[in-house]
From Swiss-Prot:
Family statement drawn from the similarity comment of this UniProt entry: Belongs to the YqgF nuclease family.
Protein name: Putative pre-16S rRNA nuclease
Pfam families registered for this protein in UniProt: RuvX (PF03652)
Localization annotation: Cytoplasm
Enzyme Commission code(s) on record: 3.1.-.-
Species the sequence originates in: Prosthecochloris aestuarii (strain DSM 271 / SK 413)
Keyword Hydrolase: yes
The organism's taxonomic lineage, starting at the top: Bacteria, Pseudomonadati, Chlorobiota, Chlorobiia, Chlorobiales
Amino acid sequence: MTKENRKRIIAVDYGTKRIGLAKTDPLQLFAQPVGTFSEEALFRAIKEISGLDGIGRILIGYPLNADGSHNRMTDIVDAFAARVHNEFPDIPLELVNEHGSSRSAGQILINSGLSRKKRHEKGRLDSASACVLLQAHLDKSH
């Protein structure tokens, strides 16, 4: 495996209140949650991951409707993606359809056996949604 391949892939689930972040393991086999952040704290977290592990790609969940059409959040995420690209111009950025990721993440949290109270803690669903996006990308790639 080349050094380039060992860089982490990260996924971002953008929300107007909280932003979920996930990253791969060093072999890019599994997604793991990093946490939930404000936008400013997210940029710091990405810089930290980049400095420690390197980042080979940034995935951003793209909020499309079931029919593939744009919605109110699409423009907001477009603006956010532009800021990410400006801040990290050397890291490839990819928008990935996030339709259904929150629902899938919610089901995973239910199946994990977490209590309802734990499942509804602020940010848990956001970071789980980022993991779902990232794991789906990894599963397609392998």
